[in-house]
Amino acid sequence: MDRIIEKLESGWWIVSHEQKLWLPYGELPHGLAANFDLVGQRALRIGEWQGEPVWLVLQHRRHDMGSVRQVIDQDAGLFQLAGRGVQLAEFYRSHKFCGYCGHPMHPSKTEWAMLCSHCRERYYPQIAPCIIVAIRREDSILLAQHVRHRNGVHTVLAGFVEVGETLEQAVAREVMEESGIKVKNLRYVTSQPWPFPQSLMTAFMAEYDSGEIVIDPKELLEANWYRYDDLPLLPPPGTVARRLIEDTVAMCRAEYD
């Protein structure tokens, strides 16, 4: 339940609007509410970090509004809370009216949900599951440059899970669609909330089975096998893609060094 922020309230402040985050001095605001002109604003407590509350404030600031990507290199827990705040802010902004009857809605006091008093419909934040997979062939890993990454970054393959599809089926389909190869020995590794805008990345490792690389030009600029000790520009630390690549490199080193 939200509350009015008082002068001596302190903590971490997620000030968000339209999927943007207020980052004065390039950092998440931390400290007394009075120091950030937040006294009197409505805020929702969305978690705790290092023993202090994390507050969500639905507000636009004229300056220093940026992407949550700018805090990705901070601690994973803090990045996750920042992502939660941005996703919740967008959820509340986009669910002011009921999609069934058109009447105004209001936030639930007990959970992350919006309620319609007219038809009693209940809405929850939508989460889009995605798969991301590192594919190994002997001492090499399959890396691709995506159409949306024209800065030279090469990463592992990923894609959204379709309706009525298992995670395993999504891996096989996405890999085939984007690269033209088949994989085997799929193994789940980890997951990562990814607020761009509302994804949950489910990470896997797999082994090459068969086929030659044939890229989908609508998705990829190029794809190739890279030996573990001769890699191109990689995604930044803190991303699950980087974790998968580093784990694959570690396995290759153990076998081939």
UniProtKB/Swiss-Prot annotation:
Cofactor comment: Divalent metal cations. Mg(2+) or Mn(2+). Binds 1 zinc ion per subunit.
Principal EC category: hydrolase
Protein name: NAD-capped RNA hydrolase NudC
Function, as annotated: mRNA decapping enzyme that specifically removes the nicotinamide adenine dinucleotide (NAD) cap from a subset of mRNAs by hydrolyzing the diphosphate linkage to produce nicotinamide mononucleotide (NMN) and 5' monophosphate mRNA. The NAD-cap is present at the 5'-end of some mRNAs and stabilizes RNA against 5'-processing. Has preference for mRNAs with a 5'-end purine. Catalyzes the hydrolysis of a broad range of dinucleotide pyrophosphates.
Keyword set includes Hydrolase: yes
PROSITE patterns given in the database record: NUDIX (PS51462), NUDIX_BOX (PS00893)
GO molecular function, one term: manganese ion binding
SUPFAM superfamilies given in the database record: Nudix
Gene it is expressed from: nudC
